[in-house]
Swiss-Prot record:
Protein's UniProt name: Chalcone synthase DIV
Pathway: Secondary metabolite biosynthesis; flavonoid biosynthesis
Enzyme nomenclature, EC number: 2.3.1.74
Short name of any one Pfam family annotated for the protein: Chal_sti_synt_C
Amino acid sequence: MVTVEEVRKAQRAEGPATILAIGTVTPANCVNQSTYPDYYFRITNSEHKTELKEKFQRMCDKSMITKRYMHLTEEILKENPSFCEYMAPSLDARQDIAVVEVPKLGKEAAQSAIKEWGQPKSKITHVVFCTTSGIDMPGADYQLTKLLGLRPSVKRLMMYQQGCFAGGTVLRLAKDLAENNKGARVLIVCSEITVVTFRGPSETHLDSLVGQALFGDGAAAVIVGADPTPAEKPLFQLVSAAQTLAPNSCGAIDGHLREVGLTFHLLKDVPSVVSNNIEKCLFEAFNPLGISDWNSVFWIAHPGGPAILDQVEDKLGLKPEKLRATRHVLSEYGNMSSACVLFILDEMRKASSNAGLGTTGEGLEWGVLFGFGPGLTIETVVLHSVPT
């Protein structure tokens, strides 16, 4: 007769959870940030709001974004004029698009990750799907399982309405799943499209306009497993993961699903809330490792916007190159909510390899991944790079 302890030991992996592959994808429709204000005010029939357009132009100019990708084309918006008003009932039409396109975009990212992984998809044991775009039952996790042809016994977890911090959340969950289920291979997918948040401008709700200047569409997929086989190629190890609520931050970032779609509300002090709490998170994560020099680690930070990155840099005394990968993804894609940090992971390992650096983490051994969003919730993941 075996004991419970023996069963528990047999169920667990020996080594740490490891990222084994990353895939990213965007919709085909690309919008140029410099000309976006003209397009946005024209398509929303708001060209008469000249002062508001000038404000929006300044927001776009200061965003540090060069381009974004969006599923919503001019043709789709003309077919759905309610999307272009500020507060028109439109949830049904938005949902009709989101419940189809979110898993479809996620499938493309997953196929890219599975191809890099190089193993049969039948080895995938768990699926974690995350989106802030649309809600359905059965969910996008179910649709993805069907689209990819995964085994019906795959264990699924669906995360809806989490927001920008959730790229860290999915890695934290995948770490626990991989380390507590021997042989597990976890497919995590973050798929975000702005069909639920796009809306016309309002002169009384400028925080909504900030979102229109920043958000873009994209999907990222990552395969996580412990104890890699010789055929698998590790990219990063997931060493520890934590989540915390920033004190005195209630209402800093809110999202509400209504008949008009998903409305976002941002307070102006979000950059200071993040920067004032980040050092405590870093200390708690890295103190066990004896690390206190924040320039000695590689950085993957959710790029909520340029003001947040600037304040984090100033608060921690980071060298400009520390947030290179983060700023690059913000520039090339905008804020893709939960998918952003996974895009940054992909950018970092590719740039590190192309530059001939010694590790996947820009030649450094240890790194940190930060996600932050509604709550204000902060996710902190400690990463260990591998040789390139």
